[in-house]
Amino acid sequence: MQKTGKALAVVMLVVVSSSASATITVLEKNTLTDPWLAPLSLGVSGSVRPEFIWHRGEDNHAGHDGGTRFRFSADYLLRPGTSIIGFYSLGVDTAHALGLKHHYDHDRSWDRQRKLFGGIKDDRYGTLTFGHQYSVYYDTIGGKSDVWGNDGNASANWIGVGGDYDGGERPRNSLKYKNTFGDLTLYASYLLPQDELVLDNSQYYRRKRGGGIGFDYRLAKDLTMSASWNQTNATVRGAGATQRHYRQAFSGAAMTWTPGNWYLVSTATMYRHYVPAVPPQSTDDYFARHGYGLEAFAGYTFPINKPYLHSVQPYFAVDTLRLQGNEHYHANHSYLGIYTQLAYGFSVYLEQTFTATTANDPNVTSLSIYYDF
């Protein structure tokens, strides 16, 4: 019965979303006559993402869920230019929810919270939010290069112990401020303590506190320079009484250039006690002492403007990750792909990843189908 209920929930979400290929406005402002409810607006959007991956290895299989998510937003207008806002994003493993037993990780739940935050937004004084949300690093650096299929192998987003905990991508219990002054956008965040995260080998990670600052500066209409500095204080403890305090630090810079139909971006990030050592080490040396990651992407969009074919974007990307400590780990990836935007919110990524790593990871071919609404 529980599995049937989960399956029906996923099917209902997909069916409801199929009526449009843009964000659905569930409730517009001034729709309700009650003066307390009239300032409220509600929206729903999402992305359904089946994915197929082929490579040499034991976990090579025909298909799985590539990151389906559903988003719910609310905006309550207090006065012109000032609103209370809320946002919730639910990640759903559709293969798990539908009981396709050979196409999902049986050790993970069928659903997970991606974001949950609220706050106040003001046209003059900026936006202040609290909860489970994107980090300053992701807003300024990581999100700029999060634009191809198998990305994120050298940015801080998810190469740490987990972006929900260490501040790399979507930290929980975070307070964030953002404001724009002409061509300059400033960001600042503070990370509150977070519950323990279970690591491999009976080890545990606990965030004590952290924070970050960053900016985007528009040098020209199509050229933006970004930078970010972040620090997280945390402990790693073993199964016994052994533990070590780490002051994790990661700083990055990015340049984004969008002349005409081009999208060009390059990022660089420095790490200290942030990326877990490869291979895994003891509690005292759990993280690589130093490291850096580089990413670059170049894509050109050809507008087709046909009823069922909107555009095609061939692209090329590269990244490299270097770690130094008790190990000297390196990973280089090159990506060649094509992104095709179809009608009714559908799009397709076809990508080949060429890999050269210390761990001898295989090359990967991936096909991702998106339905965005």
What positions do the PLM features span?
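Detector for outer-membrane/organellar transmembrane beta-barrel domains
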Residues: 181-182, 206-208, 213-325
